[in-house]
Swiss-Prot record:
Belongs to the glycosyl hydrolase 56 family. Keywords: Cell membrane, Cytoplasmic vesicle, Disulfide bond, EGF-like domain, Endoplasmic reticulum, Endosome, Fertilization, Glycoprotein, Glycosidase, Hydrolase, Membrane, Secreted, Signal. Residues 1-20 form the signal peptide. It is an enzyme of class 3 (hydrolase). The keyword Nuclease does not apply. InterPro entries: Aldolase_TIM, Glycoside_hydrolase_SF, Hyaluronidase, Hyaluronidase-3. This is Hyaluronidase-3. The gene is HYAL3. The active site is at 129 (proton donor). Its EC number is 3.2.1.35.
């Protein structure tokens, strides 16, 4: 179906969404599209205005990467994250056991206090990808953290035999990694309690594409599922989940929906620990080729996210998208012609379904997640569907099949 909308409808939807305003309501609105692209240079350097507000896309003032509607902290931007550089150089001790945690938390608190207003209520994403907090998750190039932990144990416990030293390395790493991640989230939430705090790419799924796999199902790897269950403490400490649904470069389009669906279903599974909103990260361009996502790619990422009941998506891109006037115009045209109209269609359909089926107190989600043709889309003439394939996931404070009953106490769903 076509999703192109007229200018009047675009403006009307933008006004009803309250675009560009602070967002304490993100967990309690049917679907949000957020902008995490450093596109400020398009306007300030090249005079190219990107009409994000008019397209219903939530962005920071001035379209800056960090701001009061959403922010992301990379490894060198919050506290003293320990990691090894490309040449093996240890930063902040290299491993969690070697980090002075109190110094890290003090610096993180200072940075949060000075970068986010007290009323901050948007997504706040920590992008720490160098190591996994579980020992078994550090394979491939991450084995360096196991080796460094063993060397640490040999130095700290020289009188133990090698097997006991290995045990100290394993337990010491996991305990320190947990303390680092948990305590960072606790400090952040104490300072900015309305923010949606969580780690990018968590939970993982392990359903990446391998070209030799002829029977690809999209299901998450069993070992990854087991590790996610072990990470119950991380979900309990988070206030939102930010899984990645970046499309793998060589994944055939026929498998896109299965890839995205299973990643989101795993996020919904672990989200039950704290009834957390799920905001999926979508990359605007294909890795390697740099091509913008096609209309069908948007359906299989943004559209599937909305249909499964995600709270929204975070659109991500790098500085190359605003590196020249030409690149800014390419981004502008893509926004106006493709991304913006589709985002408006899905956002408005999700809002209408919420009011039609859930009394405006919940979001619609597929009854059967595998029903691949069920989407929250408007018809080409802008009319609404009946959405019989969808049921309600109620917001905090509401219950019942159509979220019609006020409810006090713990969150029923988000």
């Amino acid at each position: 179906m076509t999703t192109r909308l007229g200018p009047a409808l675009v403006l009307g939807v933008a006004l009803c969404l309250g675009c560009g305003q602070p967002l304490p309501q993100v967990p309690e609105r049917p679907f949000s599209v957020l902008w995490n692209v450093p596109s400020a240079h398009c306007k300030s350097r090249f005079g190219v205005h990107l009409p994000l507000n008019a397209l219903g896309i939530i962005a920071n003032r001035g379209q800056h990467f960090h701001g009061q509607n959403m922010t992301i902290f990379y490894k060198n931007q919050l506290g003293l994250y320990p990691y090894f550089g490309p040449k093996g150089t240890a930063h902040n001790g290299g491993i969690p056991q070697a980090l002075p945690l109190d110094r890290h938390l003090a610096l993180a608190a200072y940075q949060i206090h000075h970068s986010l207003r007290p009323g901050f209520a948007g997504p706040a994403v920590l992008d720490w990808e160098e190591w996994c907090p579980l020992w078994a998750g550090n394979w491939g190039r991450r084995r360096a953290y196991q080796a460094a932990s063993w060397a640490w144990a040999q130095q700290v416990f020289p009188d133990l035999d090698p097997q006991e030293q290995l045990y100290k390395a394993y337990t010491g790493f996991e305990q320190a990694a947990r303390a680092l991640m948990e305590d960072t989230l606790r400090v952040a939430q104490a300072l900015r309690p309305h923010g949606l705090w969580g780690f990018y790419h968590y939970p993982a799924c392990g359903n990446g594409w391998h070209s030799m796999a002829s029977n690809y199902t999209g299901r998450c790897h069993a070992a990854t599922l087991a590790r996610n269950t072990q990470l119950h403490w991380l979900w309990a400490a988070s206030s939102a989940l930010f899984p990645s649904i970046y499309l793998p470069p060589r994944l055939p389009p026929a498998h896109h929906q299965a890839f995205v669906r299973h990643r989101l279903e795993e996020a919904f599974r672990v989200a039950l620990v704290g009834h957390l909103p799920v905001l999926a990260y979508v990359r605007l361009t294909h890795r390697r080729s740099g091509r913008f996502l096609s209309q069908d790619d948007l359906v299989q990422t943004i559209g599937v996210s909305a249909a499964l009941g995600a709270a929204g998506v975070v659109l991500w891109g790098d500085l190359s998208l605003s590196s020249s006037e030409e690149e800014c115009w390419h981004l502008h045209d893509y926004l106006v012609d493709t991304l913006g109209p589709y985002g408006i269609n899905v956002t408005r359909a999700a809002m209408a379904c919420s009011h039609q089926r859930c009394h405006g107190h919940g979001r619609c989600a597929r009854r059967d997640p595998g029903q691949m043709e069920a989407f929250l889309h408007l018809w080409p003439d802008g009319s609404l569907g009946d959405w019989k394939s969808f049921s309600c996931h109620c917001y905090w404070g509401w219950a019942g099949p159509t979220c019609q009953e006020p409810r006090l106490g713990p969150k029923e769903a988000v």
